[in-house]
Every structure is written in structure tokens, then in C-alpha cells.
Amino acid sequence: TFINVKCTSPKQCLKPCKDLYGPHAGEKCMNGKCKCYKP
């Protein structure tokens, strides 16, 4: 799921993705936006 958080590295997506899907969520930074994966 893409979320409305800008990023330059996946580390910036860590907290928003964990807030969304919990502590085992996965994250990537794609095209300047965070993408979160369900655990």
C-alpha cells in the first residue's frame, strides 16, 4: 500500500508503516513515496 509520506530512504517509512500495520510491517521507498507491506 502506498501511503502519503515522502521519502528518500526506506528508513523514513519505518515508523509510518509500523503505525499502519504493526511492528512486523514491511516498508519500501518507491518513487519518493513510502510503500507499506502487511506482515
Swiss-Prot record:
Places the protein is found: Secreted
Keywords carried by this UniProt record: Calcium-activated potassium channel impairing toxin, Disulfide bond, Ion channel impairing toxin, Neurotoxin, Potassium channel impairing toxin, Secreted, Toxin, Voltage-gated potassium channel impairing toxin
Disulfide pattern: 7-29, 13-34, 17-36
Pfam families, per database record: Toxin_2
Site (Basic residue of the functional dyad): 28
GO molecular function: ion channel inhibitor activity; potassium channel regulator activity; toxin activity
Chain positions of site Aromatic residue of the functional dyad: 37
Tissue: Expressed by the venom gland.
Leader sequence residues: none
InterPro entries according to UniProt: Scorpion_toxin-like_sf, Scorpion_toxinS_K_inh
GO cellular component, one term: extracellular region
Main localization, broad class: secreted
Family named by the database record: Belongs to the short scorpion toxin superfamily. Potassium channel inhibitor family. Alpha-KTx 02 subfamily.
Task performed by this protein: Blocks human voltage-gated potassium (Kv) channels Kv1.1/KCNA1, Kv1.2/KCNA2 and Kv1.3/KCNA3.
Domain notes: Has the structural arrangement of an alpha-helix connected to a beta-sheet by disulfide bonds (CSalpha/beta).
Protein name: Potassium channel toxin alpha-KTx 2.23
Organism: Centruroides bonito
